[in-house]
Amino acid sequence: AQTGEEKYSLGAAFKLLVQNKYYLMIVVSYLLMQIYSATLNMGIYFMSYVLKNANLLGVFSWAINIPMIVGLLMTPMLVQKWGGMFRLNKMGYIIGSLGRILVVVAGYMGSVPLMLASTAIAALGMSPLQGNMNALIATCSEYTYLTTGKRVDGTMYSCTSFGTKVGGGIGTAVAGWLLALSGYVGGAEVQSAACMNMLHILYLWMPMVLTILITLILRGLNVEKAVVEQKEK
């Protein structure tokens, strides 16, 4: 086998990818992350009709972006301190899940300050996975090489990029479809009760559920340990 190059048919490359359970976990997580982002794009409707202040969208964007940037800057140091990505990512998403649960509680309370604080906590918790995703994919590729003797680095990155586009597209389409199904009327000052309930589902409940699902996946994504075990064989 030519270990320095990737010369496989589409079918052979696909087989190599699906044989790596850790890579499949990453792909599913990536898809869920993109759907998560799409549901947060419903924020403008939630701010306008539930919180009655469309200008809050910018404030909530800052509550996501600033903690995310801080977390990304800290990720390399935290990976080193925690002895790898597995524990850091898992604990980060546990924090993220707790944050999103609090966002749901705060949303029904109508407490904007608590919603903002909880949103920031969730974003901070999710940031390590965003920061080390490429390193995770590289580790997955190393695992495939150690178990099959074949390199699939480029194929893995390409499929992950494709997954990002698919996940974002699915999330946006589903969110838009559900909003329309609930009876949303563009430009109306007041929306129906069904539409208001759907806004709560899309902006509060769905992000929470998606975050919890990713957390469950991350519990098994210890590809670093698997690589070490393969090298010791």
What are the residue ranges of the model-derived segments?
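Membrane-embedded alpha-helical bundles of multi-pass transporters/translocases
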Residues: A1-K233
